[in-house]
Amino acid sequence: MSIVVFFILICSTKKIHAQTEFDAIMMNKNQFCSGFMYNYSSWEEYWEGTLKRNNENIGTVTSQSVMYMANYGITDNLNIMAGLPYVWNKSSAGTLHEMKGLQDVSVFVKWIPYSFSFDKNKITLFAIGGFSTPVSDYVIDFLPLSIGMGSTNLIGRGMVDYQYKKFTATVSASYIHRSNVKIDRNSYYDTELHLTNEVDMPDVAFYQLRTGFRSKYLIAEALLSRHSTLGGFDISRNNMPFPSNDMDATMIGVNLKHSLKNIPGLELHAGANHTVSGRNMGQATAFNAGAFYVFYFKSKQTAQSGKK
């Protein structure tokens, strides 16, 4: 799974808000947004299967990334977005060396097939599809310091957004199909011996609920997310993780987005999340911050006249 799939950020237009592909916000036609996002996460304890433990041989594992993100409004109801992160991972103890480099490029299409309002309520349905694939030849079989899993992913997501005045609730469900990957050895053992360098990667399901406050200049949300690998196996005792492990996690978090009144088009973003339970995953706490700018490819008057 690439970092981009979980953290790709793009920008809206009607209210000029940064968003993830999980957000119920769309750009206007002919608007383009670009910006950078910084993410920091670390963990010391992790789950070896269901056993929670630490490992003094690696100490604290830290991951950082800087992503460039872009989003374009093809129409008011159809957006295309892309992102590419540079990632560097390291541990505070032991002999494992730092891993860094460009990870996976990601492209998504976001579409509103249906929306309806009644009284002060509004319900909007979204369909999102995309893919991610590695752009560099990074080492896959060096977890937990590998910068990515190395698979090409096809992602499908359905989402429903409910809004009453400034209160919102958004629920989404995603299915991620992952290609097989090749590692730098001719055999490996999961629950049995495989005399090949090709690893069968299990698919992934991802669910999220986000709810909070959405206004013209501010969005504040609480998030509950669940990542479930649909297959795989547990890390064996005192062994390193493997790309096809059964990696599950439940995360809680917050998301804040602020549009500056005195600088139209500029948006600031901040967020945090914490893993509360997991399987074959580190108990990570993460923080992110970013800045984005929105502008029209065509004049605003031209874009508005096209809606008449």
Please state what every model-predicted region is.
Residues 22-30, 77, 115-124, 166, ...:
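Short loop/turn motifs that connect adjacent beta-strands in outer-membrane beta-barrel proteins
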Residues 36-38, 68-72, 82, 107-111, ...:
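Residues on the lipid-exposed face of transmembrane beta-strands in outer-membrane beta-barrel proteins
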Residues 40-65, 144-146:
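Surface-exposed strand-loop-strand hairpins of Gram-negative outer-membrane beta-barrel proteins
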Residues 47-49, 54-56, 193-308:
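Outer membrane beta-barrel transmembrane domains
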